Design a protein with these regions (language model features):
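Amphipathic alpha-helical interaction surfaces
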Residues: 17, 135-139, 157-160, 183-186, ...
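Small-residue-rich helix-loop
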Residues: 146-198, 205
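Basic- and aromatic-enriched surface patches that contact anionic nucleotides/nucleic acids
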Residues: 1-156, 225, 233, 239-256, ...
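C-terminal hydrophobic structural anchor segments
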Residues: 190-242
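Alpha-helix boundary/N-cap detector
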Residues: 164-171, 226, 251-254, 258
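Small-side-chain structural scaffolding
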Residues: 13, 57, 91, 176, ...
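A general structural signal for well-ordered secondary-structure junctions
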Residues: 24, 82, 110, 183-186, ...
Length: 277
């Protein structure tokens, strides 16, 4: 039994037309004389041409590690509309993970926190949700500096998670998104600047603020919300820091730890001064 990673719709269409004969040709741009014909009704020369056409396929051994499969497919995925990395994951890790990420990406809290700006095409919204899962559920000490490997691990983690665990993740995800929206408004997960120009949602900031807020207790969260003006002012300064800018541009282990550390210290500073203001 083979698992089709790419081309499922095309192969399925061929099967339905040639083998099962479930439909007739309609809306032909060329060869309009074939409109309305099923496969058996085509001229014999065309039937033979279709039946004798070779299909190229890459077969990967089932025992091949998922990360290797991911990299193999990424290398051969060059024709037509090239799949985005999350679309490849969606094909390789079918199951609980794919359904759960779809649910997460459709939550009102996520959509509003990102201000309707994360596109659903190419599954970019699901990749953001997967990043939340990875940074809040996986051990960052084991992060090898390759983000794609880390995200693949997240898919495997979700496929093995219990219903109770999935509920907990989604519940905390919604709360985290809501808090970030309360604090930053339309600037959530974006770099801040003194001109109040709004840039795009930044993946690195999404990951970092997610893990920081996720780990906070309710009391500290409320303090942060109460001190959001001061927090935003301090974060604006941090966004202008050259080393921090470099840290949110890269995905190596040092950069990931640096941005989490810098924002973590910023939050601690705000919480420590909260009672004095």
């Amino acid at each position: 039994k083979w698992q089709i990673i790419d081309g499922l719709q095309r192969i399925g269409t061929i099967k339905e037309y040639v083998v099962e004969q479930k439909f007739s040709l309609t809306g032909m741009e060329f060869l309009k004389n074939l409109d309305g014909l099923k496969f058996d009704e085509l001229p014999r020369s065309l039937q033979r041409r279709i039946e004798e056409t070779n299909l190229n396929a890459y077969l990967v051994n089932p025992s091949t590690p998922k990360n290797v499969k991911f990299n193999i497919f990424k290398r051969i995925n060059t024709g037509g509309l090239v799949l985005a990395p999350q679309e490849i994951r969606n094909a390789l890790y079918q199951g609980t993970s794919t359904k759960f990420l779809l649910q997460m990406s459709n939550t009102r809290e996520f959509i509003e926190a990102t201000d309707y700006s994360i596109k659903k095409d190419r599954m970019l919204d699901r990749e953001f949700c997967l990043r939340f899962v990875c940074f809040t559920q996986l051990n960052l000490d084991n992060y090898n500096g390759i983000m794609e490997d880390f995200l693949n691990q997240g898919m495997e983690y979700l496929n093995g998670a219990t219903e109770e665990k999935l509920y907990q993740i989604q519940d905390k995800f919604k709360k985290t998104m809501k808090i970030c929206k309360q604090i930053f408004g339309k600037f959530a997960f974006r770099r801040l600047n003194t001109e109040e120009r709004r840039g795009p949602v930044n993946k690195a900031l999404f990951e970092t603020w997610s893990i920081i807020i996720y780990k906070m207790n309710d009391s500290d969260v409320q303090k942060l919300i109460d001190k959001r003006k001061e927090l935003c002012e301090e974060f604006t300064v941090l966004c202008g820091d050259y080393s921090f800018q470099n840290a949110i541009r890269a995905t190596d282990k040092t950069s990931v730890k640096t941005r989490i550390s810098k924002i973590g210290k910023l939050v601690e500073k705000i919480l420590d001064t909260g009672d004095e203001v």
